[in-house]
């Protein structure tokens, strides 16, 4: 019976995607094909042949009649059939004309390997714009320029449209990388680890087809099980967020962004040209969209090995089986560090193990089957852990002790691994130059057991599987839309200035945020009047558009207790600032709360970042702050409170009372709504906000528009 | 001319060391030799033969006349010649007798592979003590029991006294590991990286010959260039510190201590038995003695590769040469993260590079010679960096672009590397399954260039070389001996109690530490009298031996401004505590300083730890504290101040004044002297000490003896 679901799958499989001519070309023209060995125009053809490309190759060369044994044509117009994809490997100045030709010929996708465009200054930018205009006119999609190309390792295509030198076997990991150099060594690393690859894309200047578009394409590709992504920044971060949100929960995206130090970012700028948009926000984008972020490319590749064969664990509870002590200690350290737990075994499990293990074995978690333990001992431990309800994943340390039948151990691991019920990760310690152990390794490898050479590396890989489980189950929810906002509020256009305090407080009040009671006084008498209205003690702050860091300049007087002190403070400020427009902000003084900060930083091409942390002088001293990309949901705001280092302070310590966390969480969300409503806000600091047991009140704030 | 120095070296080389019979045995008896394949008593003989052991092998077996083709003897007494070393592979209960036999035969070193001793409870402990007594009586040194053994890869010996399966080629790295499993995979990892090994030792229960003793032996071995050490704790940390101090500045010691999480420590306890002594102090021991600490065993092995061939850089300034963009960005990030700097190139260097590099090259630091750059381009960049005064080391990213003569590039790198003037680390990105690139790799390998597969891994290795340079040049100096101490001070024996405040303050004063002026009052009148003497405002604290956490219990009244308030406070405390022996500590109230903490924790078998950090409630909330192992020198005390996260606070921020750091540094040193003078001090907290611009004063303190 054909069900609705199966129809959909069939439809999906037959659906033609715009990028199919790029990733699944039935025919490829190489414009700039060359008979010169080691030239890119020759290497690309050589690679297609070497990789057994299943489609047709059309070398385009004005003079040669054949290249590498394949008939060549003077121009694409001389090719008698349709062409899906063209490689362009000619000097940059000829590219606009060639793109027009491709359009006329009906070629849908073009990989421009040639350099000499936006990465080379004005002249190059003009050329890039010229060929892009032609591409738009004719509906040609451009991959590159200044790029490597793509690879599709699916045997149906074997499309090696690239000049690199690694020939991966087919698999389920797809790679997209901004840098060809990094993409290539990631591909090589998978190859060295004997992990198959699905697709590869390295798009250089990325003037048309973006990383985001490739990411979505991989997301829709049924053969792609996990994705590796490398970038140094995003030209269009919003587009990326959209794409990542679609894909990241369905398939693990393992990503690395370099240029995380100032020096690294400089090095990045020097080779990719200016990448507009985000820098520090990239990690926040990864977090928000559920991308697994790595800052070590080797860890990323090693984790990919686990994703390529293992199921995702249901939780963070791991059982360890080991036949050697020290490596289990190292593994335990790392497993715990990445958030996994080692629950004790059930009495039932202990009873079974006591009957089945050697007398020297240690029954517990880890289970030490000892070096003399054989296949049956590993098997009973594996079976026990597979049946333990409290265990979500299995970590194995397997050293090939010379006095055991290691093949038998491997066969038992493989049999249990085939069930695919819980992920199994194996730290396999052996000497592969010994034939006997090569056999053991092959049994594990063929049985789909991911094998690592170090306990820490293996533990990190299991940590990555668990992290993806958290990504899949984490639901940040939708940002709350507060409806008690004063909708009459309007803000002037951004002009790079700070708003007067009175405006700032009005804006906060309009958004339902508590502000310490305040008035603006023009003179001493008004200041005394207002102080009485507000109730002592008060704070007095000098107000003039030129004053920003008031407290550093002596423009703030705190804890004013009576009219006499008001007069003194006002007189002193008058004397100090001698400013015609000087006014005086009289505000309720609120000592004894915990000083916190909520801040906002606008981002080019991206939503503003919201910051929360310890306020007052501790902002600078401790930098104990957390950023999130807005809009911030309630769950995210809660996470901000619990992730600062001083989060204990909010709960109250040593007799001190805690704060009203709910009110802080609400302020963060209201600020998030405010800055999303008014994109002209460039910068905002509520510092400090005073958090009390019952409520939280803003006592100082500034807004730059 | 034979100088004094050269005589010493000759003497040293000929000197006979007690452990020579263990590491350089001329003859080995295998007591428990077996003809059974895969048994340890057979594998050890097989390994000795396979590794071409240069000495004589004497299998000892009551029944067999030969084992693996070698004449066997019923007992060691039947062996006609002297024996240097014996392997003991017999049931534990026979071991005491065999050790006595060994003693009688004049065997100086014994490796006990057999298990069944201290790791197996009381009976085992008794057996271990029994054979140890015999060993002492006859002057036999014991390695093990429950251990693997040793390996000496020096071709003069080829002594493979171990049952493992990795056969390293000779080299300059020596390994000592508590866990045989970890030792074995470290050895295997060096083998996989094609790094030679010098010596190997894994001593299991370590009942006699300790890791410390082996470490000293490696330190004196001229062929050992660097040492890898793995442990899960120390039985005798003082002995280890002595050994490490002797060796760590001469030769890099790369070390890893596992069991750093609670769960990991538990796992360690379950397989090594209880290791008395330190746990959290291990990192501090490593720091104090100059050991390079790793928490990732792969990083440690990769770093060893750099140490095995490269000189130590003179400083932290690195020049990068790359022929691909992205990997240079990744490398830059990591290099900067581990403390290296990328200085700009001199004008002279830039001029040379402009003349010698391709037009597409990026001239700067990194120098991007681009993928089409060949041998001459790499060479000119290398020569320039070798001659730059501001560059201490060279990092190379070398991808084997198919369109360049990669052998020529490799040859140029090797020629410059042979100079050994500055360390060269190479991230070599290639496909070793391609013959052409295998040749390139061999050129680099034979030329002693350490090659890595990932930029981050390579950068970490260079970071380790730099770290050793810091170790070699760091001189913490000797602990200062303050002579203005009141030498009449005495302390009772430790009894697990807290000293009364009056005693605590007297002790601090005796050690020249400023304490806020104080008196002990018996009643209200005395309290008022003393408050007047001290000067208001004061603090009043309830004093009785039963009161420890006074402030939590309402036993502290601060900011008392006059006699009336004194009376009120005293009356309230009387009512609250209803304690016959209740007294009242009247002390100067000192608001406005920065609250800091200095603390002490005693360690079993080791000097106490000194702690410094943010005081008051921030101790618990932020845990912004630094520990050092006492005695703490002036430099170390300075490091403590500069390494807390809030160190900026001490310098003063946003108009706030800084503190008198010198006075804090002195307090730390005086406390260090105090606890070294009085080992009965179990615990001490000066919390808070109030730091002002001019001085630092202790306002509260407790001491447990």
What do the PLM-derived regions correspond to, one by one?
Chain A
Residues 2-705:
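Catalytic-core regions of core metabolic enzymes
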């Amino acid at each position: 019976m054909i069900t609705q679901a199966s129809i959909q799958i069939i439809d999906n499989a037959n659906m033609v995607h715009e990028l199919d001519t790029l990733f699944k070309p039935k025919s490829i023209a190489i414009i700039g094909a060359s008979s010169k060995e080691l030239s890119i125009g020759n290497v690309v053809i050589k690679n297609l042949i070497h990789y057994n490309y299943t489609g047709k190759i059309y070398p385009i060369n004005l003079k040669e009649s054949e290249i590498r044994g394949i008939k060549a044509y003077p121009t694409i117009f001389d090719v008698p059939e349709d062409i899906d994809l063209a490689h362009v490997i000619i000097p940059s100045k000829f590219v606009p004309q060639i793109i027009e030709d491709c359009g006329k010929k009906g070629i849908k996708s073009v990989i421009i390997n040639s350099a000499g465009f936006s990465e080379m200054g004005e002249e190059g930018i003009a050329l890039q714009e010229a060929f892009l205009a032609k591409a738009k006119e004719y509906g040609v999609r451009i991959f590159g320029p200044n790029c490597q190309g793509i690879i599709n390792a699916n045997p149906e295509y074997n499309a090696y449209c690239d000049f690199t030198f690694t020939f991966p076997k087919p698999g389920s990991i797809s790679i997209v990388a901004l840098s060809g150099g990094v993409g290539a060594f990631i591909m090589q690393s998978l190859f060295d680890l004997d992990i198959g690859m699905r697709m590869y894309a390295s798009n250089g200047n990325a003037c048309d087809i973006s990383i985001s578009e490739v990411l979505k394409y991989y997301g829709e590709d049924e053969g792609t099980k996990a994705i590796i992504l490398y970038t140094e920044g995003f030209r269009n971060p919003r587009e990326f967020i959209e794409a990542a949100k679609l894909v990241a929960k369905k398939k693990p995206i393992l990503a690395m962004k370099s240029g995380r130090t100032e020096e690294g970012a400089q090095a990045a700028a020097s080779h990719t040209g200016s990448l507009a948009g985000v820098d520090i926000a990239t990690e926040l984008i990864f977090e928000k969209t559920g991308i697994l972020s790595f800052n070590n490319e080797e860890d990323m590749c090693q984790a990919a090995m686990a994703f390529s064969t293992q199921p995702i664990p249901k939780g963070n509870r791991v059982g360890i089986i080991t036949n050697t002590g020290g490596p289990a200690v190292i593994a335990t350290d790392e497993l715990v560090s990445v958030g996994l737990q080692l629950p004790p075994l059930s009495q039932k499990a202990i009873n079974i193990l006591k009957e089945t293990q050697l007398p020297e074995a240690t029954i517990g978690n880890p289970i030490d089957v000892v070096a003399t333990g054989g296949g049956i001992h590993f098997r009973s431990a594996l079976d026990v852990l597979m049946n333990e309800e409290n265990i979500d994943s299995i970590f194995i340390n397997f050293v090939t002790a010379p006095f055991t039948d290691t093949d038998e151990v491997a066969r038992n691991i493989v049999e249990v691994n085939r069930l695919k019920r819980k992920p199994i990760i194996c730290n396999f310690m052996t000497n592969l130059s010994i034939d006997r152990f090569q056999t053991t390794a092959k049994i594990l490898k063929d049985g789909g057991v991911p094998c690592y050479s170090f306990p820490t590396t293996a533990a990190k890989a299991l940590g990555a599987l668990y992290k993806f489980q958290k990504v899949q189950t984490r639901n940040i929810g939708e940002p709350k839309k507060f409806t008690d906002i004063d909708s009459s509020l309007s803000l002037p256009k951004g002009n790079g200035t700070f708003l007067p305090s009175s405006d700032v407080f009005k804006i906060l009040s309009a958004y339902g945020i508590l502000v310490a009671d305040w008035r603006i006084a023009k003179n001493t008498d008004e200041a005394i009047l207002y102080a009485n209205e507000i109730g002592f003690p008060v704070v007095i702050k000098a107000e003039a558009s030129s004053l920003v860091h008031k407290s550093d300049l002596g423009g703030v007087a705190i804890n004013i207790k009576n009219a006499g002190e008001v007069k003194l403070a006002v007189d002193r400020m008058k004397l100090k600032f001698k400013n015609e427009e000087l006014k005086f902000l009289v505000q309720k003084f609120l000592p004894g709360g915990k000083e916190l900060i909520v801040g906002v930083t606008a981002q080019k091409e991206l939503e503003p970042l919201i910051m929360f942390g310890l306020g007052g002088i501790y902002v600078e001293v401790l930098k104990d702050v957390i950023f999130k990309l807005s809009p911030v949901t309630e769950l995210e705001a809660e996470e901000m409170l619990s992730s600062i280092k001083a989060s204990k302070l909010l709960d109250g310590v040593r007799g001190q009372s805690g704060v009203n966390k709910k009110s802080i969480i609400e302020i963060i969300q209201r600020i998030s709504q405010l800055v999303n409503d008014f994109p002209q806000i460039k910068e905002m600091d509520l510092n400090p906000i005073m958090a009390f047991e019952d409520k939280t009140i803003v006592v100082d704030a500034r807004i730059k528009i």
